[in-house]
């Protein structure tokens, strides 16, 4: 699970859970197939679609923060990630 950093809990990601879509921040160098295989292996679910976008790093007074990648993962109907649902409720 080196590629997945953490689950994202925002207003939009909470709305997407009802559509069986989960949002994760991942390492920017990870590929879509790596992330898909990690999610399927770790959570025991079937992934049918993945959307990703790269969020830019931000400038700071001293240096900058690194950019990262956000994945919205859609699961097959009947599958869910219960640990994230319990976190949200």
Swiss-Prot record:
Keyword annotations for this protein, in alphabetical order, are: Chloroplast, Plastid, Ribonucleoprotein, Ribosomal protein, RNA-binding, rRNA-binding
Q: A GO BP term, please?
A: translation
Checking PROSITE patterns in the record gives: RIBOSOMAL_L23
Presence of keyword 4Fe-4S: no
Q: What is its main location?
A: plastid
Coiled coil segments of this chain: none
Compartment annotation:
Plastid, Chloroplast
GO cellular component terms? Answer: chloroplast; ribonucleoprotein complex; ribosome
What Pfam families does this protein map onto? Answer: Ribosomal_L23
Stored PANTHER family: 60S RIBOSOMAL PROTEIN L23A
**Its family?**
Belongs to the universal ribosomal protein uL23 family.
State whether it acts alone or in a complex, and with which partners, per the record: Part of the 50S ribosomal subunit.
The protein here is known as Large ribosomal subunit protein uL23cz/uL23cy
Gene name?
rpl23-A
